[in-house]
Amino acid sequence: VGQEFYGEYLAKTDPLGADVPNPVSHVAYGYATQMCVLDKKTGRIKKLVAAHDVGKAVNPLSCEGQIEGGVVMSMGYALTEQYPIDDTCKPTAKYGTLGLFRANQIPPEIQAIVVEKPGLNVAGGAIGIGEITSIPTAPAIADAYYRLDGQRRLTLPLENTPYAKKK
């Protein structure tokens, strides 16, 4: 809290419609950070803040929706989803038993912060807001639980949380 960090990475892309062999039309990088706030009494997530660098937000509302959707999807990965496989990597569970995150488990607040850096010399100034939305969630949640109870959780789904499947 109260700290600020700055980083920058610029990649060269060819202009849209450029007549060059093997044009570079887009870049695949991004910067994202997330913070999880737990209810100290229940251990459930009260709020998750997600800030994502998108370059130019061509459609800001859609960017926010992409962030929120990625956060919810990866909350399931972090907290409830089990995907058991056998030695041949064949799934051994039925879809309904995988522990997908449910609508009633979504925290009261997901704050999506779209960070723009206009003027980038890339395709339309946008650098993308896809898979990156789901990457920082599990570490943010694991760190919140560590700060709550001092216990490091190093496997997913995280154990000893109110969301964990009872054994």
Give the label of every model feature segment.
Residues 1-167:
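C-terminal catalytic domains of large/alpha subunits in multi-subunit enzymes
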